């Protein structure tokens, strides 16, 4: 997408100064004609227009944009000044008597977003300036980072002109084609939380996703699924779509988009996004609720949304798969949803796990179905049509009893042969544990291989598409291969240290603006406790992922550690991975251990070994921008924390090309 329609006002500064205040104000208010505008906002704009006319008198050739939208963040920058080849981001706080931390972060966030996702800004210097109009003077200095983003500069009404002159004189001068800059493409890679918020508000998936040649276009996959849904509806058919993809390739984003598209399509065509990942569901729902409540600021009193109403609406869009199952267990009626999207469908329980759970937890002694079989039976209650969309990740199973994709095919073969099965041939790769020969042996099924149902490139880290390959080689014990791949991760920092305080300080120094940092560890990393890392303490993922820097429950405080079960499917900017002796290098290869009672026990069962390895794969792929790994030094006076346990891990990680802090 381009940003040409993403601002309320654009003009050369000399033209802006000649325009009447009311003319400029008219353009600003027109952008918000569908919303209730508070008088306070209109007054703030009047003030900004007068102030900008006063201070920009020395910059007649610069270009000014007002109310410039940053789609990924869902907010608008008060003003952008394009001058001498640099971008000045101006954020006003009219009437503010101090420079509060959240406002400083906000200005920095705008600069970071432009630098990372707006193509024409990649190689330009960007200076965020926070203008707290009534705050005291602060010493100003232009400090550019290696990527060309300056540390936020603090200004007030009195010294803004001096600050602008300082910035102008401090930066190298060049020329920028303003029209090219404005029309340049914007390719964000939002977090799953940001994506859900944007789609929920009605943004299109192409507005919030990359569309460059390096990534398969998500719109292609979503459009293909939409055609399958239309065909099923028109021809009274039942179909299942199996969408595969690399970790972070955008499967959940595709699923959320399909859910929102079909929710809006017709009132009698309900769609729901289902996940068995409790923390993911809780975090996404709470994020949507908070977003809706934040909108209240712009609504008249009689239109403000109450929390309970916002929660009900969010719950209809995103549901826990186990709640969906229980609701439909109590009824034999078809569900209201005609389209259901199952996130991480390979995690659905096999017959033994599902039956055991239903007997123990639900008192259902006669339940004898796998989870895929039961969920398909629920959707099969529809007399006319329905579509099931399965989002399938490869090589990520971390729980006992997760059946993989074969359980879905088996259920279709045994009970629902009339269903159409749409999939990509990528599903036969080893990561998905489904062989073409096995599928062909299942007899007559309505199979439709379609390439558009595979998402090939990881979008999770906008800095490092090769990250999943690197982590895969590292976890597989292929150190030399990992080291070779690491050479291509030049813009994705990965560090290792034996000092936890150093790890924490590194995370704090790497993060800018409101970039989120946090500590994670394996759920069986029991012997990190002497380091102050206690994995058995329950965290609230909604607080950990969503609370602000000032809240001790947030990940920012680096006090509460999240495990693979808390963070699966979610991500933060900079992650600190705390490594314990449950996955250690011995005689040149990885060995898995489980802590039981008061000692480590070697894990021989191949499935359980795989779960432990994959827990570290999950942890190491949670950082959008970089990773800091902490490996304890150990203590030879403690049999459970022998130094040799940890030295092998540390040495191996360094041999993979990971730099020590």
What are these regions (language model features)?
Residues 387, 557-661:
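C-terminal accessory regions
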Residues 255, 399-402, 423, 428-581, ...:
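Conserved helicase/translocase motor-coupling segment
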Residues 307-379, 559-563:
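Conserved RecA-like ASCE ATPase "motif II neighborhood" in helicase/translocase motors
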Residues 209-239:
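N-terminal pre-P-loop "Q-motif" helix
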Residues 1-189:
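Accessory nucleic-acid engagement/destabilization modules that flank
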Residues 251:
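Conserved lysine of the Walker
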Residues 243:
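Hydrophobic anchor at the beta1->P-loop junction of P-loop NTPases
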Residues 270-289:
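Conserved Walker A/P-loop ATP-binding site and its immediately adjacent core
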């Amino acid at each position: 997408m381009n940003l040409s329609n993403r601002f309320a006002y654009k003009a050369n500064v000399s033209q802006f100064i000649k325009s009447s205040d009311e003319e400029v104000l008219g353009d600003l208010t027109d952008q918000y004609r569908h919303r209730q505008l508070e008088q306070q906002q209109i007054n703030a704009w009047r003030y900004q227009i007068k102030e900008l006319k006063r201070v920009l008198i020395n910059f007649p050739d610069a270009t000014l944009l007002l109310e410039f939208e940053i789609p990924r963040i869902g907010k608008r920058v008060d003003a952008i000044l394009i001058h001498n080849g640099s971008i000045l981001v101006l954020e006003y706080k009219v009437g503010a008597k101090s420079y509060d931390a959240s406002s400083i972060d906000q200005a920095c966030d705008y600069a970071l977003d432009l630098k990372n996702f707006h193509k024409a800004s990649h190689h330009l210097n960007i200076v965020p300036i926070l203008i707290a109009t009534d705050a005291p003077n602060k010493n100003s200095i232009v400090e550019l980072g290696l990527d060309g983003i300056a540390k936020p500069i603090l200004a007030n009404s009195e010294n803004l002109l001096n600050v602008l002159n300082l910035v102008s004189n401090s930066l190298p001068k060049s020329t920028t084609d303003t029209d090219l800059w404005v029309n340049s493409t914007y390719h964000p890679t939002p977090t799953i939380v940001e994506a859900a918020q944007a789609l929920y508000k009605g943004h299109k998936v192409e507005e919030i996703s990359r569309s460059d040649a390096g990534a398969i276009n998500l719109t292609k996959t979503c459009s293909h699924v939409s055609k399958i849904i239309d065909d099923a509806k028109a021809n009274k058919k039942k179909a299942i779509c199996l969408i595969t993809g690399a970790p972070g390739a955008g499967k959940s984003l595709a699923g959320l988009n399909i859910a929102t598209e079909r929710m809006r399509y017709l009132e009698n065509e309900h769609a729901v996004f289902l996940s068995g990942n409790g923390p993911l569901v809780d975090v996404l729902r709470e994020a949507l609720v908070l977003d809706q409540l934040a909108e209240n600021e712009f609504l008249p009193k009689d239109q403000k949304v109450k929390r309970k109403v916002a929660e009900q609406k969010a719950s209809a869009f995103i549901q826990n798969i186990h709640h969906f199952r229980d609701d439909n267990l109590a009824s034999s009626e078809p569900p209201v949803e005609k389209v259901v999207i199952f996130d991480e469908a390979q995690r659905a329980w096999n017959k033994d796990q599902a039956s055991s759970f239903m007997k123990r937890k639900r008192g259902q002694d006669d339940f004898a179905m796998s989870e895929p079989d039961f969920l398909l039976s629920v959707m099969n209650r529809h007399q006319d049509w329905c579509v099931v969309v399965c989002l399938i990740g490869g090589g990520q199973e971390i729980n006992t009893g997760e059946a993989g994709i074969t359980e879905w095919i088996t259920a279709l073969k045994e009970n629902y042969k009339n269903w159409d099965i749409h999939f990509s041939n990528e599903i036969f790769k080893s990561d998905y544990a489904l062989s073409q020969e096995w599928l062909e042996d299942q007899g007559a099924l309505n199979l439709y291989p379609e390439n558009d149902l595979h998402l090939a490139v990881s979008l999770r880290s906008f800095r490092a598409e090769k990250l999943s390959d690197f982590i895969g080689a590292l976890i597989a014990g292929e150190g030399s291969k990992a080291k070779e791949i690491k050479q291509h991760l030049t813009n994705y920092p990965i560090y290792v240290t034996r000092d936890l305080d150093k790890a924490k300080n590194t995370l704090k120094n790497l993060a800018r603006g409101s970039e989120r940092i946090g500590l994670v560890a394996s759920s069986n990393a029991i012997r990190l406790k002497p380091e102050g890392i206690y994995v058995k303490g329950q965290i609230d993922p909604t607080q950990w992922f969503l609370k602000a820097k000032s809240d001790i429950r947030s990940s920012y405080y680096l006090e509460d550690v999240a495990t693979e079960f808390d963070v699966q499917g979610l991500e933060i900017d900079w992650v600190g991975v705390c490594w314990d002796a449950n996955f250690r290098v011995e005689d040149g290869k990885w060995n898995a251990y489980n802590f039981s009672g008061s000692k480590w026990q070697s894990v021989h069962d191949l499935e359980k070994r795989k779960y432990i390895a994959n827990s570290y794969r999950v942890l190491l792929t949670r950082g959008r921008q970089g990773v800091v790994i902490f490996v304890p030094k150990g203590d030879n006076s403690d049999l459970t924390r022998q130094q040799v346990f940890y030295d092998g891990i540390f040495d191996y990680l360094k041999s993979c090309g990971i730099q020590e802090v």
